[in-house]
């Protein structure tokens, strides 16, 4: 699963453009006590690729938008933002895309999962400025957006990122978002607030075998790349050493040197370049340097993984896994969980979703980001500590006063 930022990206571009235009027009004045408005719901963003990836009919997309509109109605009742002052509110929704992941055993087809997407809340500051002798008032500009992600529980939502040893392999595993207390009565996991029947059940442990399989695929990819490199260098060395090819290069050099002031010097220069190239290619293939050494090391690293997997018993392979970057060796970094100082590894728990419900039904909401606006104790966090009533302050007010019971009732 992935969060589709197409709509957000366009909005952000428009926001930045507006700010530049306003600043260039003259000095702005924030109107922190000016009443604002909740603007009408913006057109729902459900691009063709997302609809296709989600196997979503127009009727299903419309029903999903209806659910987001119901959530929007609940948010509008939040007492601290119901009658905005110093800012105006814009909200919009989107349908997120979905694609099969290359290394994700058992990942369901899109039609077996509920639709996913999100609602974006933005509190935009009210300000005015002078242009051509006229006072212009606007409620646009740049702000910190608050996302309400619906039915999105996969990698890249609120987790801590990829494991370095997994490289660029396309997979759906990640470091489990860990519980970090509560915010406004909602459990915080990683950088998100989770509203669900059982937040901890959104993810399922990744087995040690599965974690090592991804490492093995990443290392196999490195071996394949180095083998191709060595193959290309070997082929080039054969050409450089080929007597016929060398004779042709020297003959061409002699022909080119015929009109030069010192033809013999030019030919010697070409002979030297051939010698230098041959030496460089030989060094590149050496077992002590270059691609030759890299391939030997990569094969050893791959064998380290495959040999470890082969030595594991079935029970050890099936054990939940965890990861610690401070482990030093591969066996120190990947361990069976639980282990002190070791971060659990997980996958999305696709079976969390109730398949008997309509695919448009909301079953989980994750509010993110959290640290950007709630980490007020960090004096370097300018957004969280901004005096503006818009942006982070409005986001906090929304979350602190919204009817969470109504949101829970809205979830299926």
List where the protein language model places each region.
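Acidic/histidine-rich, surface-exposed loop or edge segments in extracytoplasmic proteins
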Residues: 29-51, 363-387
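Surface-exposed amphipathic alpha-helical segments
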Residues: 376-412
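Short, solvent-exposed recognition patches
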Residues: 48-361, 370
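Bacterial N-terminal signal peptides that target proteins for export
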Residues: 1-10
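Boundary at the C-terminal end of the N-terminal hydrophobic targeting segment
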Residues: 24-28
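Bacterial N-terminal signal peptides
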Residues: 9-21
């Amino acid at each position: 699963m992935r969060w589709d930022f197409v709509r957000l990206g366009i909005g952000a571009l428009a926001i930045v453009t507006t700010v530049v235009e306003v600043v260039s027009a003259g000095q702005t004045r924030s109107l922190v006590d000016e009443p604002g408005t909740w603007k009408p719901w913006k057109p729902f963003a459900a691009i063709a690729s997302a609809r296709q990836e989600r196997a979503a009919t127009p009727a299903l997309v419309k029903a999903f938008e209806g659910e987001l509109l119901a959530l929007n109605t609940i948010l509008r009742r939040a007492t601290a933002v119901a009658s905005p002052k110093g800012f105006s509110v814009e909200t919009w929704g989107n349908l997120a895309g979905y694609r099969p992941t290359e290394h994700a055993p058992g990942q369901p087809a899109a039609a077996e999962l509920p639709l996913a997407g999100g609602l974006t809340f933005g509190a935009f500051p009210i300000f005015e400025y002078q242009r051509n002798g006229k006072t212009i008032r606007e409620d646009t500009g740049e702000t910190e957006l608050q996302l309400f992600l619906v039915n999105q529980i996969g990698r890249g939502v609120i987790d801590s990122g990829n494991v370095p040893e997994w490289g660029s392999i396309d997979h759906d595993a990640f470091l489990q978002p860990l519980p970090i207390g509560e915010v406004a009565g909602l459990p915080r996991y990683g950088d998100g607030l989770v509203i669900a029947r059982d937040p901890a059940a959104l993810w399922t442990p990744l087995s040690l075998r599965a974690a090592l399989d991804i490492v093995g695929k990443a290392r196999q990819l490195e071996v394949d790349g180095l083998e191709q490199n060595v193959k290309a260098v070997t082929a080039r060395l054969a050409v450089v050493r080929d007597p016929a090819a060398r004779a042709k290069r020297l003959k061409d050099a002699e022909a080119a040197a015929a009109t030069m002031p010192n033809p013999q010097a030019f030919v010697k220069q070409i002979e030297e370049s051939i010698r230098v190239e041959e030496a460089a290619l030989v060094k590149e293939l050496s077992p002590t340097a270059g691609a030759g050494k890299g391939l030997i090391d990569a094969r050893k690293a791959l064998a380290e993984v495959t040999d470890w997997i082969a030595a594991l018993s079935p029970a050890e392979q099936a054990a939940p896994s965890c990861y610690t970057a401070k482990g030093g060796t591969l066996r120190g970094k990947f361990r069976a969980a639980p282990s002190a100082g070791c971060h659990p590894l997980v996958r999305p728990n696709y079976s969390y979703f109730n398949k008997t419900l309509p695919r448009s039904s909301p079953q989980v909401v994750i509010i993110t980001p959290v640290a950007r606006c709630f980490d007020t104790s960090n004096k370097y966090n300018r957004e969280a500590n901004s005096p503006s009533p818009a942006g982070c302050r409005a986001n906090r007010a929304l979350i602190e006063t919204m009817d969470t019971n109504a949101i829970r009732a809205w979830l299926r």
